[in-house]
Amino acid sequence: MSSKHVAVLLGGFSSERPVSLSSGTACADALEGEGYRVTRVDVGHDVAAVLQELRPDVVFNALHGPFGEDGTIQGILEYLEIPYTHSGVLASALAMDKAQAKHVAKAAGIPVAEAVVMDRRSFGNQHPMKPPYVVKPVREGSSFGVVIVKEDQSHPPQVITSSDWRYGDRIMVERYVAGREFTCGVMGDVALGVTEIIPQGHAFYDYDSKYVKGGSKHVIPAQVSPNIYQKIQTLALKAHQAIGCRGVSRSDFRFDDRGDGEGELIWLEINTQPGMTPTSLVPEMAQHAGLRFGEFLRWMVEDASCLR
């Protein structure tokens, strides 16, 4: 039994709060099962004071979205000198900004789709690029605010310029890549197995596909050629290293194999705070590699540090 005191950060105040509560609760329960002394911290604006009073040995970061995975909480933990899991300040901030992460990935030789970044308020009656394309908020997760513009749409969707839009003014317009969706986790300096994600009843891997029971089917190991499987693993590890991630990350890909030849493999984005319930993608990959959920979390706790 470990004598370490682990504070699990969960909840928070981003749009991904429900996801974080699920991840954090699952992690806290599993870590208690591994013998750690666990305190659950539902994060508010007083989190620094709460942690100063608790003085845990390690913080397990189960937050998602802005504040939790954009370098903000990581900076607080560095200042408090409390070791923590997942990526550090710079990598977290960089990965949270889809446009900047794409620049770094492209510079590292990772294939990406063409994209432009713009202010949503300048989204007029003309398409910013030839459809089909995807509109993504630059700094959101869980597919919040993602809009697919199809080939036959004569005008851009009005929802993007609507006053009801809640996902920030900076958006990225990216060429739509047809085909299959794959994802690959990285644990330290090792790429885990590749999973194919098959949305059930949805056009793409949206919020419901990710979090509603039966919303998607996960196939691991992915049924794809050995060459493409290995290439996905290589690119996931390369993205993890280029962006400077630590601990665990997950990269998402699209693979269009409809034409002649091997097909087009495109890196979409990296997630430095992937979902952490037993049925989430990365824990499934760890299980495929022979690690129980609790063992996987134990590795993350023992890997925790400052100056990440």
UniProtKB/Swiss-Prot annotation:
The cellular component terms of Gene Ontology attached to this UniProt record, alphabetical and capped at eight, are: cytoplasm
| GO molecular function terms noted in the UniProt entry | ATP binding; D-alanine-D-alanine ligase activity; metal ion binding
Annotated positions binding Mg(2+) 1: 252, 269
Q: Which family does it belong to?
A: Belongs to the D-alanine--D-alanine ligase family.
For this chain's record, the cofactor binding note is: Binds 2 magnesium or manganese ions per subunit.
Protein name in the entry? D-alanine--D-alanine ligase
Q: Which UniProt keywords apply?
A: ATP-binding, Cell shape, Cell wall biogenesis/degradation, Cytoplasm, Ligase, Magnesium, Manganese, Metal-binding, Nucleotide-binding, Peptidoglycan synthesis
- For whether the record's keyword set contains Nucleotide-binding, the answer is yes
This entry's Enzyme Commission designation comes to 6.3.2.4
Q: Which HAMAP family match?
A: Dala_Dala_lig (MF_00047)
Q: What PANTHER family is this protein classified in? A: D-ALANINE--D-ALANINE LIGASE, D-ALANINE--D-ALANINE LIGASE B
Claim: Ribonucleoprotein is one of the keywords in the record: no
| Binding positions (ATP) | 128-183
Q: Which organism is it from?
A: Sinorhizobium medicae (strain WSM419) (Ensifer medicae)
| Cofactor(s), by name | Mg(2+); Mn(2+)
